[in-house]
Amino acid sequence: MRIGAYQFAVSNSINHNYEVIKKAIIRASADGIKLLVFPECALTGYPPRDIESSSVVDFQKLDKVYDQLQDLINENEIHVIIGTIFRKDNEYYNSAIILKPNQDKQFYHKKALWGWDRDNFCVGSESGIFEIDGCKVGVRICFEVRFPEFFRELYMDRTNINIILFYDVADIDDEERYDLIKAHIRTRAVENITHTLTVDTISPYQTAPTALYDKSGYPLIELKRNEEGLLVYDLDDFELDFGEKGRVEVSDWVTEKVV
């Protein structure tokens, strides 16, 4: 399956973000991409960096944008995962919307909340596991990368690839944080023996990679930091090598003992 990730400077304008996402979808479809992912809160902006709070989002406009995106996805026969904000009654969630050709939209709501997230959002409860073009895909959002437990849930369900949407930036060029987040991602890939695709916004300074790591945590492709761009990769290596088989066997043994 050809997969893609698009990094860009997320803004406070739903219309602007939609136009960037629309162009990226059309470009990705022309490149034969079947699954395209975008950063955390890519449609709405992230509170309070881009918008004052989750409650100021124009949800009527957002619903119209979802409909426009669904038409675009039907036309281009592509699966898309986009960061957004979800409202249910008076509760708001930091969410990923999963859009598939000619199917109902699905959501994953972020569980690990702290700081600005806790100020603006409620804790989600969904598994974050979706079937996309014959693959079992796990979805997690930003801060969750720091907790192996959230990824062990995905391992237990034998996901083929895990996706992490980030809005992780700094006001200074913090390469140390970038490397730290990258280390977390590589560890999650290794310990769960699962390809891991990540995507981040780019402004002011990007502090998480837009990249793909293999089942042993090795980087397969990584975009240049702080520049808008499209990552493209043909992912077809789901067979386990000798070391990966060992990690699966021991992981399953340890999990049985814990459970």
Question: Model-predicted segments: where are they?
Answer:
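Short polar catalytic/cofactor-binding loops
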Residues: Q7-S13
